[in-house]
Amino acid sequence: TTKKDFMKRIKLLTLSCLMSLSLPSFAQFSPDHKVSLDKGDIKSFIGDKESKGERKVYKGDELTTIGMPVGGICAGQLYVRGDGTLANWWIANNAYNTGYGIDWLLNFDTPLGPWKVCYQTFEPMSYIDQGFKITVNDGNKTITKELNKKDFDDISFIGEYPIAFVEYAQKKQELPVRVSAEFYSPFIPLDAKSSATPATIMKYTVKNTSDKKVTADLEGWMQNLVCIDLKGRADGMLQNKVIDNNGWKSVYMDMRVDNLPAKTAGKNRKYEIFDNFESGNYSRWKVEGTAFGRKPASGEQCNQNNFGGNYGNFLANSYTNYDKPTGKLTSRTFTIRNKYISFNIAGGAHPGKTCINLVVDGKVVMSATGNNNEDFLPRNWDVSEYKGKKAYLEIVDAVDGDWGHISVDNIEFSNSPVDAPTITIDKSHAYFGNLALSVFDGNATGTADDSENNLEYAEAELGKKLNGALTSSMTLQPGESKEVIFVLSWYFPNRPLSYKGSEWNKPLPPNSPAIGNMYANWYNSSLDVANQLRENYAELSKKTHDFHDTYYNQTTLPYWLVQRIMMPISTLATETCQWWATDKFWAWEGVGSCEGTCTHVWGYAQAMAALFPELERNLRERTDYSVSLQEDGGILSRNGEHGILIDGHASVILRMYREHLMSKDNFFLARNWDKIKRSIQYIIREDGNEDGLIVKTQPNTYDISFNGANTYVGGLYLAALRAGEKMAYIMKDTTTANYYKKIYTAGSENTMDRLWNGEYFFQDVDEKEYPKYQYGKDIYQTEAINKALQSIWKFNWTNDVKAQSEAHLPERYYAHAGEPGLFICTWPYSKHPGEDGVRYRDEVWTGIEYQVATEMIKRNIIDEGLAIVKGIHSRYDGKKHNPWNEIECGDHYARAMASYGVLQAVQGYWYDGPKGIIGFDPKIEKNDIIGFFNAAEGWGNISQIRKNGKQTNSIEVKYGRLYLDKLQVTLPEGMNANIVKASVNGKVIPASLTNTNGYTEVSLNGLQICANDKLQIDFE
């Protein structure tokens, strides 16, 4: 088997449940199978795959949901929105659990306000006051505009991760200047440290478009957000300081927790009780429905757990009969005379459905929900704007499912808010740290409080707004442009150890022992971050732009495709990914959701291994083959905890081989070989009789266990054996290699004999003994593999999920009516099993879509594979869903980083670092293509031109270096090259040619190619 064939098989053998969960039958289609055989005009859908196409410019309502991560990898989470404002400020170890993705967990409250997550249409949230404005004077008049959608109605956004480009424009131009901006953090593949800088660069360009000289002031302001999530619950004094850094300016923001002024708020507070329900009746309320009963509840109801914090003996509580009843309480009308309405609330977090509402003039003007727990928390509404108006309250329960209840108590009117319970914090608290807004302009001016000019120091109590600001001034002649570079840097070193995470929609526990952030080993403050960034700005900016240009501008692949492939890779710069101060990479499945860099979900992700292989090797050696490796060779699924998931276990073995291939030598493999053999022996024992089939219980990524022989787990098992065989040969362990090969061969043959029905692979299971979700299909012989992939296209992909989703309601929605998608499971020839079917059967996961598309493209089922990817692109289009946030069990789901496999497939690219081999067999643009390559020590462009009976292949290194001993390519049909000419930068070098196993191999005698060198090989 050639290296090329082997890598195809390895990838293919990881195909998921899609090919293992359809009842094998040749009957007519089941009437409840609603996936149409008519896929539409897919050629029009994917566009011209032989040309690059237009750069995507987002405008108008396409800007709605945009939130592109622009901080460092593993350094928190910060978005730039479609209008160039920043959002989702999870840079202070303050992220929330964004799972589980089900409809009643999409919205919740935070101390800063309502929050939204997962697969719905919304603008990313920001409760931090931050922005930029420009003031321009042309000698006649002065105009000031904020750089956001409020003042610019024709904004353009181009998102090419890691760089976002924003152009500020008005349909009716008022300004004599044009303003544009770039937002990014250093992102340099193969340099994880530089790419993990806790900072965002905001480079503004101002161009005078008039025929007059103008002056312009560009001001950036930023709110001090230190410990802002603790406002109302902790005491501290926010501090802003303007600092002159010898050639650049900063506003440094932190907080002190000592020498605080004595608190007087809350003492002798006067209030009027509207209702605390201690009367034991609803005399002040109109009762509708049955949820709230005929009288107030006396505490928690039957089967209501963890209830506490209510006032007195009675309260309004709609938890009755397991959350099934619904109803509403409507208060008597009252006149608003005080500044605040305060109350205690607990229960469900369903906005508008489990809530208390304030109604003024017939409209709900304020609303609050519970937080999906039973702990009462005080809430304060500032109703001063409605003073003197008539109003009434509604307490609503309109949900009959999970958390379908609301509890309210102690409603008060007052001119001062109820104090929330306070906690004592110090500098070790997870949220404690500092940030800095800087401008690389020594002549800039600054103020510590933007309500006054030129203040060098300002302070405010935690919970009150304190904004610092910097202004850069310029004079522009007609047609002249100037750049101003602002940097937002942060330093929050006390990341808590959150192995267990939190409940859905809750903040990650801040009080766990600190594990720290890796960047705290490199910097001592946010000012230090900004200073080092300034000192190295030219180099870091150039390398980031070099990568951007190499990947986006120099390649000829369809623009939409390269853009989509890179979009989920921004997950590395979200709170899904952490790099601990102990130098350990650790990650969730999605932001705050499902802990422990789990073996099964992360087994799909391909991007980090290609772009930052040191972090994948870190994961293998510091987790999978460290705390997770058991004495018997089993690999625990979640950072040394939980059980062994057999698909994840096999994928770890495969990834060890992948990490070896992305290494420059054999040292990584050699130092781990004994542990690898132990883990392979474990999965062989799961086989039992070495026939290459696993029939015993198989826990896996679907949060269930399979039983019986199948080709989801079975394919991964045989792929792991095949990888083990390859690694054994490298280690000169021939006996072990032959042993693995024997089992692999038996398994491949037995699979074809027992599990192939001529159309797809099925599962061999005793339905009487095991659960009914065990049905199957998958891979092995080439003809069978291709047929099975075509069956997936036929039975699982649709250009509109509406019919199938309405017939078989998914547990969670990741594709809505009118959107295309690939269903995890269908039963085309038998009745859909409903709840007896495999879990998540009716869902659509982008990670699996990328994986299937990768395998289709590798096997020349190209249009269909591209259509699957284009389907993802059409769902995450900006209008409906954030293009940079692919959802599964939580935001920024790691499985979606399988997208990088599509790039490797469409380019027909393979790489063996220790052997110095690159293969290139593009599936599209064969006659004229420029692609992107990544290797152990370098990256750049790889190309192929066919013209006049000749072929030229080139490799241009843009970063690092490349060791290349052999280049394997495919020549056009009918071309039998016998002459090869190789040159580096035009200088001829020795090379020899061999035609073997369907490709042409050029031997280059261990060539070393450095940055900016170009290798060219001409075939005749």
Segments predicted by a language model, with ranges:
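Short beta-strands within extracellular/lumenal beta-sheet-rich domains
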Residues: 313-337, 376-379, 470-471, 951-953
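Aromatic-rich carbohydrate-recognition surfaces in CAZymes
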Residues: 106-123, 130-139, 522-540, 578-584, ...
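Active-site core of glycosidic bond-cleaving carbohydrate-active enzymes
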Residues: 590-633, 649, 674, 701-704, ...
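Extracellular carbohydrate-recognition regions
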Residues: 263-294, 417-418
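Extracellular carbohydrate recognition and processing domains
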Residues: 359-391, 396-406
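Non-catalytic C-terminal accessory modules of carbohydrate-active enzymes
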Residues: 74, 85-87, 93-101, 105-182, ...
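Acidic/polar, glycine-enriched structural segments that form the non-catalytic walls/loops
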Residues: 29-51, 57-58, 62, 165, ...
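The feature captures the catalytic groove of carbohydrate-active enzymes
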Residues: 193-195, 201-203, 428-439, 446-459, ...
